[in-house]
Amino acid sequence: MMTRLLWAASLALPLLQLHAQATLTPGVARFVSVNAPVVALTHARLVDGTGTPARVDQTIIISGAHITAVGPSASTPVPAGAQTIDVAGHTVLPGQVGLHEHTYFGGVKRLTQMSVSGPLLYLSYGITTGMTAGSQLPYQELNQKSAVDAGGLPGPHFLIAGPYLNGGPPRNAMSRNLSTADDTRRVVAYWASEGATWIKFLGAESRDVLRAGIEEAHARGLKVTGHLCSVTFTEAAGMGIDLLQHGFITNSDYVAGKQPDVCPAGNMRVQADVDVNSPAVQASIRTIVANKSAVVSTLGVYETFMPDRARLDPRAMEFLEPETRKEVEATHANLASGGLIVPTRLLQKMMAWERMFVAAGGLLGAGCDPWGTGFLPGIGNLRNYELLVEAGFTAEQAVQIMTLNGARILGLDARIGSVAVGKVADLMVVRGDPVATPTDIYNVVTVFKDGVGYDSQRLRDAAKGKVGVE
């Protein structure tokens, strides 16, 4: 019923420009807790997204959809008539920018779209912008984006990558397999005309296909990302790929005997025994950085394939439909006998590789990659924060990776990604201090998108039991 009401209302609304304030339908307005012409958040602890140390007792002024003042509470005047919200004891951060998001739930017997639950969960946990890194139902995602942007569906601003593009034997029933450069150019051109702004490649395409896809996408103003295998990271970087997914674990540069245009069977496993400090690995990092290809960290989803670390978060399990929950619980119980197993040493090497990539000047973002191991939108993004801190980044650096760096990768950093005057008021208000206590990051109270504050608990309540259904 909720799906029908929200989508029916959205169809009557015009598509509005990204980051403009939309007129909210009653179905969306019921999730809103703050919606005033001028809002003052006072006495906040502020992590601004730039990587600089957190500042205490700060005031943020929001006028319409934008931030108009940021500074110490003692010296930042609150405009007359503003709705003033004392957020002492809370931390304000930029809205997160996710770079590996999905609105379908896979890895279980019945793949389903998260047409309502996905946007609700993403927004409830502070993700205000997300790039869908591959779609099973691309037209559903395009329509979903239109509904969100028009104010008919609560959720983040989405950038759509269209369907998965691949090569060789089918690895995904809903991917488009490509064997020639000409065919690739035609398909990329088509999805550009349909509204995709990114293109996502999977792991079996040839170098010629990937090169053609990158060239055609760039000629049309689109960017390209990939979960690669048959083409190595350094090969793709040399072609000008914009964004490489998952980092060390998927980089087939490190597979001995790798054959051109072939995805080696041991990829994502042999990396566990690769010396991450070796000259070859260091050289590959330098090549990726020199070619200005960014990387997406997805540490959290791979942790769910680790028998010694994986856990089912009770908060996430509440959002699963009962039959889907049983499947996820069964998968978890039998994890050690499953397919992909990530040993602890591999996760540690993934973390080390990401630190070295950033130290070398690389641009690192982050994304969720929801999956049937119980790794869900929003809450999975926040697990990445904890793991980035565990990896050795400061809390402020981890926030930067998940916010401003993501905005830079998307080309939106002039508008979003940090808490600064003139930027869009995309913010998350968190109870506690996630700098001192990383687990506090889950205590999201209010999420501002385009200057409108959404009640996180109301959003989460509406998503309970929905993943696996809608």
Predicted regions and their residues:
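Divalent metal-dependent hydrolysis catalytic cores, especially in the metallo-beta-lactamase
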Residues: G118-Y139, G155-P163, S193-E205, I214, ...
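Boundary at the C-terminal end of the N-terminal hydrophobic targeting segment
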Residues: L18-A22
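Metal-associated gating/positioning segment near the N- to mid-region
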Residues: H90-G152, R171, R176, D182, ...
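Acidic, glycine-enriched loop/beta-strand segments at the rims
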Residues: V28-S33, L46-T59, P72-S73, L376-I379, ...
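Histidine-rich, glycine-flanked metal-binding segment
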Residues: T23-G27, F31-S33, P37, L46, ...
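Bacterial N-terminal signal peptides
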Residues: L6-Q17
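Active-site neighborhoods of metal-dependent hydrolases
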Residues: V187-E205, T250-A391, K466-E470
